[in-house]
């Protein structure tokens, strides 16, 4: 892991506020905004995982102490003057940000980085208080301010905004943010874990399983990922069987509609499955009622 700043006391305290699951977020944030839906199973799993992720967390949620002062530079007002409503209603135009940075000096980029850090910490405080809409807005403004060359910082901001959006039940937007965070930092375990949970909540079980497998490849000690890799294959199989039955039912209804003018129905066709191969065969029966 990279170097950790000793002066990152406040962001270090915020780690639990930005945990992947609601239980440990509640432990950090205190009484406000409990979420009983996810408390029943996640706390034990993540207590086992916390020790293994501790080093990763310190680096991911804190990117250096910075000066709070920020002098306005040319072109910055184009980003800063956007309303909070615009920030939250539309996604960032990455190409625009890259174009904006082309003529920036290193000093200007560093100032924008420092301002994005201030906005990130502001969002962290809002998240801890349960002000998730405000936190999302702060992370969005931080993303607009943070130069694209600081990929690690931007990956953290995307992951943090995903957490704020999760709290508002904006699951698809949160998945999109997690994907952007992972694209910028493929080893970002927390973002992968967060996306895996979101995939489960949106019934995208195959995608969730792939993310959990990816986590185990990076760190086999993550208990939540191990448990999911044992649990999800059976759930996926059961879902596929259910979908197959629904599909066959619809095909039967369609078949009856087509065969009815000929005095036939799907009862005239018996479907048998070969237990050894799993394949199906169809046999025509002239008088199906006589075979019962």
UniProtKB/Swiss-Prot annotation:
A Gene Ontology BP annotation from the UniProt entry: protein folding
The GO terms this record gives for MF are:
unfolded protein binding
An annotated GO cellular component of this protein is: peroxisomal membrane
Q: Which PROSITE patterns match?
A: TPR, TPR_REGION
Per UniProt, which keywords does this protein have?
Answer: Phosphoprotein, Repeat, TPR repeat
**Key word NAD present:** no
Q: What are the start and end residues of each TPR repeat?
A: 116-149, 155-188, 189-222
Q: Which InterPro entries match?
A: TPR-like_helical_dom_sf, TPR_domain_protein, TPR_rpt
Q: Which domain of life is it from?
A: Eukaryota
Q: Where is the composition biased (Basic and acidic residues)?
A: 45-55, 75-85, 99-125
**Phosphoserine-modified residues are where?**
83, 90
Pfam families in the record:
TPR_1 (PF00515), TPR_8 (PF13181)
UniProt key word Iron:
no
According to the record, the residues making up region (Disordered) are: 23-125
Complexes and interactors: Interacts with the GAP domain of NF1. Interacts (via TPR repeats) with HSP90AA1 and HSPA8.
Entry-linked PANTHER family: TETRATRICOPEPTIDE REPEAT PROTEIN 1 (PTHR46014:SF1)
Q: Supply the name of the protein.
A: Tetratricopeptide repeat protein 1
Q: What is the lineage of its organism?
A: Eukaryota, Metazoa, Chordata, Craniata, Vertebrata
Task: State which gene encodes it.
Answer: TTC1
């Amino acid at each position: 892991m990279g170097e950790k700043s000793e002066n990152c006391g406040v962001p270090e305290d915020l780690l639990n506020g930005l945990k992947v699951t609601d239980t440990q977020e509640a432990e950090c944030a205190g009484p406000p905004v409990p979420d009983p839906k996810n408390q029943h199973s996640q706390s034990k799993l993540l207590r086992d995982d916390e020790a293994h992720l501790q080093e990763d967390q310190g680096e991911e949620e804190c990117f250096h102490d910075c000066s709070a002062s920020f002098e306005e530079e040319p072109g910055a007002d184009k980003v800063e003057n956007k309303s909070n409503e615009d920030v939250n209603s539309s996604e960032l135009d990455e190409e625009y940000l890259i174009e904006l940075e082309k003529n920036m000096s290193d000093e200007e980029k560093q100032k924008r980085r420092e301002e994005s850090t201030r906005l990130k910490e502001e969002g962290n405080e809002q998240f801890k208080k349960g002000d998730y809409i405000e936190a999302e807005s702060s992370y969005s403004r931080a993303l607009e301010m943070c130069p694209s060359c600081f990929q690690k910082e931007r990956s953290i901001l995307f992951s943090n905004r995903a957490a704020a959006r999760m709290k508002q039940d904006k699951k698809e937007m949160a998945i999109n943010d997690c994907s952007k965070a992972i694209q910028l930092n493929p080893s970002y375990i927390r973002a992968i874990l967060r996306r895996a949970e979101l995939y489960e909540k949106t019934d995208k079980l195959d995608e969730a399983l792939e993310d959990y497998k990816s986590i185990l490849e990076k760190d086999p000690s993550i208990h939540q990922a191990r448990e999911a890799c044992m649990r999800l294959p059976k759930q996926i199989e059961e879902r596929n069987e259910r979908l197959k039955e629904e599909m066959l039912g619809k095909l039967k209804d369609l078949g009856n509609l087509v065969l009815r003018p000929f005095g036939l129905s799907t009862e005239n066709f018996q479907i048998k499955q070969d237990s050894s191969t799993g394949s199906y065969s169809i046999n025509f029966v002239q008088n199906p009622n006589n075979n019962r």
